[in-house]
């Protein structure tokens, strides 16, 4: 079933310039809708960890992008207090109290999640935004004004602090999604974009900006990483001097490995997830 679905999506992607809301064949519409529905339920995800490596299901990302070609904009209501005009319905538009109870997570107004995003049990969405294709795993808090970009993968027991920006893949078009592994803490107003991977048990201080070209300097070893924060790292914003010493450029600095003191400062509050 999945292989046939993938083949149909891959072919539709090759023919994408000819597709429109009026011209798209029913089989393509149904295939894309199937993928979005499975993303919404967590049955499919854009990236999965296999062993030590993350594998990106590019065909699923293609389906997300194709969905924008298959729908017209339409008015949408948000509980009667606002009107919107978009192609993607909100995830909770038709949910009842029973639906929320069964899903087992909290949504604080006016948090918004788009259809095609997945929110796992015991997660908390403060007034925040979760885009299509994103995966938010169990026990994670998306704090106030944080944004989880399209197709981003957020692990278990992660804390995304206030104003954190997790980049998406749709615009500008990115090959791989941002991945925040289990038990990470991302400090206020930090930005993680361009498919950067934050490995498990890491702590990113407030105001740290990480993209593929950002130097991630380990002060203990002198090693420089790109696009990946090693597991268990504590990272702060810093600068590195140029070779000629005339100027310095922004970098992120791994100052130490996570210890008991760090964990005490960044521990999650189970009372907020009951």
UniProtKB/Swiss-Prot annotation:
Major localization class: cytoplasm
Enzyme nomenclature, EC number: 2.3.1.117
Subunit and interaction comment: Homotrimer.
HAMAP family according to UniProt: DapD
Catalytic activity reported: (S)-2,3,4,5-tetrahydrodipicolinate + succinyl-CoA + H2O = (S)-2-succinylamino-6-oxoheptanedioate + CoA
Family per record: Belongs to the transferase hexapeptide repeat family.
Lineage: Bacteria, Pseudomonadati, Pseudomonadota, Betaproteobacteria, Burkholderiales
SUPFAM superfamilies hit by this protein: Trimeric LpxA-like enzymes
Name used for this protein in its record: 2,3,4,5-tetrahydropyridine-2,6-dicarboxylate N-succinyltransferase
């Amino acid at each position: 079933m999945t292989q046939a679905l993938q083949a149909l999506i891959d072919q539709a992607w090759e023919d994408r310039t000819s597709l429109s809301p009026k011209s798209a064949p029913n089989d393509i519409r149904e295939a894309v809708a199937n993928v979005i529905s499975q993303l919404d339920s967590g049955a499919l995800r854009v990236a999965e960890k296999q062993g030590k490596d993350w594998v990106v299901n590019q065909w699923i990302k293609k389906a997300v992008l194709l969905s924008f070609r298959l729908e017209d904009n339409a008015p949408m209501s948000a509980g009667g207090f606002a009107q919107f005009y978009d192609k993607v319905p909100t995830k909770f538009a038709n949910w009842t109290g029973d639906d929320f109870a069964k899903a087992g997570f909290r949504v604080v107004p006016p948090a918004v999640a788009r259809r095609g995003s997945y929110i796992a049990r015991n997660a908390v969405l403060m007034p925040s935004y979760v885009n299509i294709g994103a995966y938010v795993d169990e026990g994670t808090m998306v704090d106030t004004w944080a944004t989880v970009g399209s197709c981003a993968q957020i692990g278990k027991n992660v804390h995304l602090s206030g104003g954190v920006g997790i980049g998406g893949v749709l615009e500008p078009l990115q090959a791989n999604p941002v991945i925040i592994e289990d038990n990470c803490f991302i400090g206020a107003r930090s930005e993680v974009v361009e498919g950067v991977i934050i490995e498990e048990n890491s702590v990113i201080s407030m105001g740290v900006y990480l993209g593929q070209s950002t130097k991630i300097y380990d002060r203990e070893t002198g090693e420089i990483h790109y696009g990946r924060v090693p597991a268990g790292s504590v990272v702060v914003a810093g600068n590195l001097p140029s070779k000629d010493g005339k100027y310095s450029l922004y970098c992120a600095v791994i100052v130490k490995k996570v210890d008991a003191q760090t964990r005490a400062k960044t521990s999650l509050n189970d009372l907020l997830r009951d």
